[in-house]
Amino acid sequence: MGILIPAWVDDRLVPVDKLEAHEKGLKHKAVSVFAVRDMDILIQRRALGKYHTPGLWANTCCTHPDWDESASTCAVRRLREELGITGLYPEYRHRLEYHADVGNGMVENEVVDVFLAHVRGPLQVVPNPDEVMEIRWIGYHDLLAEVQRYPERFTPWLKIYLHHHADTIFGPDLIISAKA
């Protein structure tokens, strides 16, 4: 058995193998983080070895909490594990649910706690090559335009976040300021 994540089975939250949750499309908990510096968002391109959505661009980091782990602890852990980022403490922004086919017979059926981390000052990013093949900073509206033009290059969840939840994730300050 692999990593156990919190998933709902028969309306009860129980530990379930992460791969099984995706194969069966079970509703499960997830965590997503966006790191923002001024008007730019740090995005990552998922490693080619990932079992779903390899090579696609996603938000700064995303994962599933371990069975006994809080969402905020998970957010900090995954910033460190995926990107080598330490000393950044994301703030909780929003809980959302989505359902998306992610290829290879896998389904994301997630209840996601979304966090926003404001980067002030230098940030050392050292991507874990097992998780991330590339990173870049991109302006909010440039990201929207790129997703519109090349949707096949982005994960389903990033497109859902940007198109349906941007106001609650980023707040009006980033969205309005980015237009100026």
Swiss-Prot record:
According to its UniProt entry, the protein's GO biological process terms are: dimethylallyl diphosphate biosynthetic process; isopentenyl diphosphate biosynthetic process
Catalysis: reaction(s) = isopentenyl diphosphate = dimethylallyl diphosphate
Q: Start and end of every Nudix hydrolase domain?
A: 26-160
Q: Name one GO molecular function term.
A: isopentenyl-diphosphate delta-isomerase activity
Q: Name the enzyme's class.
A: isomerase
Q: Which domain of life is it from?
A: Bacteria
Name where it's found: Cytoplasm
Q: Which GO terms describe its cellular component?
A: cytoplasm
Cite the Pfam families for this sequence: NUDIX (PF00293)
The cofactor named in the record is: Mg(2+); Mn(2+)
InterPro entries recorded for this chain? Idi_bact, IsopentenylPP_isomerase_typ1, NUDIX_hydrolase-like_dom_sf, NUDIX_hydrolase_dom
- The record lists Mg(2+) as bound by C62, E82
Assigned EC number: 5.3.3.2
Q: Which UniProt keywords apply?
A: Cytoplasm, Isomerase, Isoprene biosynthesis, Magnesium, Manganese, Metal-binding
Known Gene3D superfamilies for this protein?
A: Nucleoside Triphosphate Pyrophosphohydrolase
Primary subcellular site in the record, as a coarse category: cytoplasm
Note how many cofactor molecules are bound and how. Binds 1 Mg(2+) ion per subunit. The magnesium ion binds only when substrate is bound.
Pathway named in the protein's UniProt entry? Isoprenoid biosynthesis; dimethylallyl diphosphate biosynthesis; dimethylallyl diphosphate from isopentenyl diphosphate: step 1/1
Sites where the protein binds Mn(2+): H22, H28, H64, E108, E110
Give the positions the UniProt entry annotates as the active site.
C62, E110
Main function: Catalyzes the 1,3-allylic rearrangement of the homoallylic substrate isopentenyl (IPP) to its highly electrophilic allylic isomer, dimethylallyl diphosphate (DMAPP).
The record's similarity note reads: Belongs to the IPP isomerase type 1 family.
Which NCBIfam families does the UniProt record give?
A: IPP_isom_1, PRK03759.1
The protein's name: Isopentenyl-diphosphate Delta-isomerase
